[in-house]
C-alpha cells in the first residue's frame, strides 16, 4: 500500500513533545488508531520512515521506500537553543506503535525509546550507516541522528602526533648529560637498546637487564676488580646446630706460630682428683699416650688425645660470638651459649625442672633418689617395728585396760584367746 505524501507538514516540536492537544485521546467510539490522528496522511502499516538528518534550516527530510518523493517536516522550537560550548552528536531510535489496541490510545506506547546514545566525535558516515541498517528492519520505526561538522571536533579531540611507538619510548642514551662534570665521569655502561616496533609488537620488548645485576657479593663491581667473599657471622642457635650436626664453628684460625703443634706442653696445674685410680679400659686398648712430660694418660681415640693436649697447651679454639669467651671444647661452648639463649633442654623426670646441662640434671636427680631411699628406709624400719610389736606375746600383768572400751575391757580380758570352742 502506497503512502500518501505531503510536501510539507508544519509540526511544532515543543507542542509535540511537551503539550498534548485535547483531541489527542479519542473517545470510546473511536475506531482509528492514534497514529492516524497524528499523521493523517500516512496509512496504517506504512513503510519505514527514516530521518536521515537535520538540515541547517531546521527541516527534517523523510524518505519513503514505496514512494520516491521526499516528505519534509518543518518545525519551529519554542525554546531557544543554548549556545553550545562543546559539540555533541546524538543518536537514538524512536518507534511509534502502529497496531490498534482497541478502546483507546496506549499511553505507554506513544514513544518507545529503544536505544539512545550520546557520542562524542561521531563522523556523519557512521550515522548514515546506522540509519541504513535501521531501514532494513521489518518493524516501522523512526531513526533520527544529528551530527555536527567534523572540523569542529578535530581540533578538540585530535590524536597526538606520534607516528610509531619508537618515538614515544625513546632511548635515553640519545640525550647525553650536559653537566660540566660529565667529562670527568667515566662513560655510562652500555645498555642494550630495546627492539623496534617493527618486529611485530605494538610496544617494544622489555630489554634483558640480567647481565647488569651479577650475583650477590659481586654487585657494583667493575670488571677489573676481583670479587670478595661475604662471610656471615653465625647466630648462637646456628652455632649449636653446627655442633649438633658435627660441623665446625671454630673462630678465626690462629697463625702458624700459635698453632697447637708449636705451643709448649705445660704441666697440668690442677692435678687429677684420683690420680691412682685405675682405668676401666685395658692399656693395650689405649694406644694414644699423652706426649706431655709427667702425664701418664692414655686414650683409645685420637680426638680424645687432641682434646686432652689442649689442657697442656692452653689452646681454646672455640669462641663465643656474644661475649667473645674462648673454650677448649666444643661441648663447653654449646652449654655456655645456652646461658645467653636461655635454652634448657634437659628436664627432671620427677619434678619437671629444666636444666641447660645434662650433668646438672643428673646431679639434681640424685637429690630425688636420696630422698626416695630415705623414705624407703624409714618405711621399712616402721614396718619392722610394727611387725615386732604385734607378734610379741603379752602377759596378764602387763595388760592395760583399754580406754575406749572401759568396763567392757574386763570381759574381753577374761576370755582366754587359746581356748577353743
Curated annotation (Swiss-Prot):
Matches recorded under InterPro entries: EGR_N, Znf_C2H2_sf, Znf_C2H2_type
The keyword Amino-acid biosynthesis appears for this protein: no
GO biological process, any: regulation of transcription by RNA polymerase II
Compositionally biased spans, kind Polar residues: 236-247
UniProt GO molecular function: DNA-binding transcription factor activity, RNA polymerase II-specific; RNA polymerase II cis-regulatory region sequence-specific DNA binding; zinc ion binding
GO cellular component terms listed in the entry, alphabetical order: nucleus
Subcellular location: Nucleus
Keywords in alphabetical order: Activator, DNA-binding, Metal-binding, Nucleus, Repeat, Transcription, Transcription regulation, Zinc, Zinc-finger
SMART domains the UniProt entry points to: ZnF_C2H2
Alphabetized Pfam families for the sequence: DUF3446 (PF11928), zf-C2H2 (PF00096)
Region annotation Disordered: where it falls in the sequence: 127-152, 179-200, 223-288
Extent of Low complexity compositional bias: 127-145
Coiled coil feature spans: none
ZnF (C2H2-type) residues: 288-312, 318-340, 346-368
Annotated function: Sequence-specific DNA-binding transcription factor.
Entry similarity comment: Belongs to the EGR C2H2-type zinc-finger protein family.
Listed PANTHER family: E3 SUMO-PROTEIN LIGASE EGR2, KRUEPPEL-LIKE TRANSCRIPTION FACTOR
Protein name, entry field: Early growth response protein 2
Organism: Xenopus laevis
Amino acid at each position: 500500500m502506497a503512502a500518501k505524501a505531503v510536501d510539507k507538514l508544519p509540526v511544532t516540536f515543543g507542542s509535540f513533545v511537551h503539550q498534548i492537544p485535547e483531541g489527542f485521546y479519542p473517545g470510546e467510539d473511536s475506531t482509528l488508531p492514534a497514529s492516524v490522528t497524528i499523521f493523517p496522511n500516512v496509512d496504517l502499516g506504512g513503510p519505514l520512515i527514516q530521518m536521515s538528518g537535520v538540515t541547517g534550516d531546521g527541516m527534517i527530510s523523510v524518505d519513503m521506500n514505496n514512494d520516491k518523493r521526499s516528505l519534509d517536516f518543518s518545525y519551529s522550537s519554542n525554546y531557544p537553543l543554548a549556545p553550545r560550548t562543546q559539540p555533541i552528536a546524538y543518536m537514538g531510535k524512536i518507534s511509534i506503535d502502529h497496531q490498534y489496541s482497541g478502546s483507546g490510545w496506549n499511553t505507554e506506547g506513544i514513544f518507545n525509546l529503544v536505544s539512545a546514545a550520546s557520542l562524542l566525535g561521531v563522523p556523519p558516515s557512521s550515522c548514515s550507516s546506522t540509519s541504513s541498517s535501521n531501514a532494513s528492519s521489518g518493524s516501522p520505526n523512526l531513526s533520527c541522528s544529528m551530527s555536527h561538522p567534523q572540523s569542529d571536533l578535530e581540533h578538540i579531540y585530535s590524536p597526538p602526533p606520534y607516528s610509531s611507538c619508537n618515538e614515544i619510548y625513546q632511548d635515553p642514551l640519545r640525550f647525553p648529560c650536559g653537566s660540566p662534570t660529565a667529562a670527568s665521569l667515566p662513560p655510562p655502561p652500555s645498555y642494550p637498546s630495546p627492539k623496534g616496533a617493527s618486529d611485530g609488537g605494538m610496544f617494544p620488548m622489555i630489554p634483558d637487564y640480567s647481565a647488569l645485576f651479577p650475583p650477590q657479593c659481586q654487585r657494583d663491581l667493575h670488571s677489573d676488580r676481583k670479587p670478595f667473599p661475604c662471610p656471615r657471622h653465625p647466630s648462637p642457635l646456628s652455632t649449636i646446630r653446627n655442633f649438633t650436626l658435627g660441623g665446625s664453628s671454630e673462630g678465626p684460625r690462629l697463625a702458624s706460630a700459635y698453632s697447637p703443634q708449636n705451643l709448649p706442653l705445660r704441666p697440668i696445674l690442677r692435678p687429677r682428683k684420683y690420680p691412682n685410680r685405675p682405668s676401666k679400659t685395658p692399656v693395650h686398648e689405649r694406644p694414644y699416650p699423652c706426649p706431655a712430660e709427667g702425664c701418664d694418660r692414655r686414650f683409645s681415640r685420637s680426638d680424645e688425645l687432641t682434646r686432652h693436649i689442649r689442657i697442656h697447651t692452653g689452646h681454646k679454639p672455640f669462641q663465643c660470638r656474644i661475649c667473645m669467651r674462648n673454650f677448649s671444647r666444643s661441648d663447653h661452648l654449646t652449654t655456655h651459649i645456652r646461658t645467653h639463649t636461655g635454652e634448657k633442654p634437659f628436664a627432671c623426670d620427677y619434678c619437671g625442672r629444666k636444666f641447660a646441662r645434662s650433668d646438672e640434671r643428673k646431679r639434681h636427680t640424685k637429690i630425688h633418689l636420696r630422698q626416695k631411699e630415705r623414705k624407703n628406709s624409714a618405711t621399712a624400719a616402721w614396718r619392722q617395728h610394727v611387725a615386732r610389736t604385734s607378734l610379741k606375746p603379752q602377759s596378764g600383768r602387763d595388760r592395760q585396760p583399754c580406754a575406749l572400751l572401759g568396763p567392757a575391757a574386763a570381759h574381753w580380758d577374761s576370755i582366754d584367746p587359746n581356748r577353743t570352742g
